[in-house]
């Protein structure tokens, strides 16, 4: 294991030059202190967990000190926000400190969010508040634990620095880890500014460092797009299967790696509602839960447009047609597993559709339903769950078909339970739980957020004594809409 001073930087993106990013020094927070850290994320850098207890830890991740081999830079990009093109966005409050290479030879971007003003801050102050930093930390690590690809979060550093949003709040910084911070919007920026030479340079860079298997392909740029499309389809399938609503699927928030990126007003479904909108600012429901699939397709079309100088339009269009079948196959496989099926049958998609329709009509808790379905043999489980539904006739018909389908699977009931518990979490990050932990942290009590993080890092385990985190939300805690302000 390494100490903080032993981290090895090799800053490949910085070497692309000033056309792609601008060198900026972080602006330190006042009186920094550690709020919460992830040992699992620290392990990605081979960091000794004891390093989090050192004063240097908070100093490095609050802008007070910086590694001599780090090269903090703000990246430039653009993007479509709520369907409209914004010509220049860029890192307005975050800095790519550099790329750390671990013992396995893996590269990890260290990105300090809330590090102060940059040339791309526009009217913003470059800061992040404690509230949004905790939310991103919890979600990043929880999604990873659920098996949903995501950027990672090393730590949150709090401070005495005041930041003004709807009200005065405490400033904070989040240290985000990801193999790459390149977004769809990076390519859009160079396409729409007609910098096609730089666009090609960026494409060659990301293929060389992130998709080296494509280097020998006769059409690497086309295969890059296809790979991004495949990864995005798989990601969205996992979002939909586990009830995750991102809330701000702008193209500048879409990763080329197919990982969940840039957390804002996200939410997991409480009661199942396909039309759920988690973003208070999303008046039209563009980024509602049920729209995430078509929006991902739309965003991929925006990326495809940016690649037209190097890939034929016909080829891009044909590739776009792969998205929905890939998504549907991945989603159906996940949902089968959530229902306890290890084999495929032709009627499975319709069985799942009927279930979701019944859940929608009765406002059934999405996470608890699947967990409880695996607690007992199928016939006993559906009898227990029946009381959650309003349309009893419809549910009874579905339950009969489900039990018959389960019987055709055969197998040991104990093995079925283990199989289902491995894919159906007991614990999910509900917004009201995050809010309670945030309110305690804002008063200086970090124990609740640390405990919540620990529980959510093992979402499939029973964890005796932590059952309160698996309870149904109170009425006030359901369907919370979160502001974009952060």
UniProtKB/Swiss-Prot annotation:
One of its GO terms (molecular function) is AMPylase activity. The active site is at 252 (proton acceptor). It is an enzyme of class 2 (transferase). Mg(2+) binds at residues 253, 262. ATP binds at residues 90, 92-93, 113, 125-126, 176, 183, 262. Nucleotidyltransferase involved in the post-translational modification of proteins. It can catalyze the addition of adenosine monophosphate (AMP) or uridine monophosphate (UMP) to a protein, resulting in modifications known as AMPylation and UMPylation. This is Protein nucleotidyltransferase YdiU. The lineage of its organism: Bacteria, Pseudomonadati, Pseudomonadota, Gammaproteobacteria, Pseudomonadales. The gene is ydiU.
């Amino acid at each position: 294991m390494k100490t903080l001073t032993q981290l090895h930087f090799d800053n490949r993106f910085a070497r692309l030059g000033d056309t792609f990013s601008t060198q900026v020094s972080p602006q330190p927070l006042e009186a920094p202190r550690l709020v919460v850290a992830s040992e699992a994320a620290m392990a990605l850098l081979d960091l000794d967990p004891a390093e989090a207890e050192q004063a240097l830890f908070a100093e490095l991740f609050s802008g007070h000190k910086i590694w001599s081999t780090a090269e903090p830079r703000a990246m430039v990009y653009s993007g479509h926000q709520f369907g409209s093109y914004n010509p220049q966005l860029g890192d307005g409050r975050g800095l790519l400190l550099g790329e750390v290479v671990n013992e396995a030879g893996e590269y990890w971007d260290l990105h300090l969010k809330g590090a102060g003003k940059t040339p791309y801050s526009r009217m913003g102050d470059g800061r992040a508040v404690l509230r949004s930093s905790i939310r991103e930390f919890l979600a990043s690590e929880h999604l990873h634990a659920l098996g949903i690809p995501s950027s990672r979060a090393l730590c949150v550093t709090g401070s005495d620095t005041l930041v003004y949003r709807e009200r005065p709040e405490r400033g904070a910084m989040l240290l985000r880890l990801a193999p790459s911070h390149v977004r769809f919007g990076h390519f859009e920026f160079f396409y729409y500014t007609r910098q096609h030479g730089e666009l090609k340079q960026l494409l060659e860079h990301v293929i060389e460092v992130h998709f080296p298997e494509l280097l020998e392909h006769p059409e690497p740029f086309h295969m890059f797009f296809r790979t991004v499309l495949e990864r995005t389809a798989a990601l969205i399938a996992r979002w939909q299967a586990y009830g995750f609503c991102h809330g701000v699927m702008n193209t500048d928030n879409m990763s080329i790696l197919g990982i969940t990126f840039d957390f804002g007003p996200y939410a997991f479904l409480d009661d199942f509602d396909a039309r759920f909108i988690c973003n208070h600012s999303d008046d039209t429901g563009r980024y509602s839960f049920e729209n995430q699939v078509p929006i991902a397709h739309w965003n991929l079309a925006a990326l495809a447009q940016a690649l037209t100088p190097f890939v034929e339009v016909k080829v891009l269009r044909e590739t776009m047609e792969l998205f929905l079948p890939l998504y549907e196959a991945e989603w159906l496989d996940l949902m089968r597993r959530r229902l306890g099926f290890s084999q495929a049958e032709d009627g499975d998609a319709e069985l799942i559709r009927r279930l979701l329709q019944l859940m929608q009509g009765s406002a059934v808790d999405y996470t608890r339903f699947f967990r409880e379905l695996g607690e007992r043999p199928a016939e006993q489980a559906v009898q227990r769950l029946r009381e959650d539904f309003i349309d009893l006739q419809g549910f009874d018909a579905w339950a009969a078909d489900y039990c018959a389908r389960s019987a055709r699977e055969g197998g040991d009931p104990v093995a079925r339970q283990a199989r289902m518990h491995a894919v159906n979490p007991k614990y999910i990050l509900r917004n009201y739980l995050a809010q309670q932990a945030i309110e305690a942290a804002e008063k200086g009590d970090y124990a609740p957020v640390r405990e919540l993080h620990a529980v959510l890092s093992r979402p499939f385990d029973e964890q005796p004594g932590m059952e309160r985190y698996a309870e149904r939300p109170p009425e006030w805690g359901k369907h919370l809409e979160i502001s974009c302000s952060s």
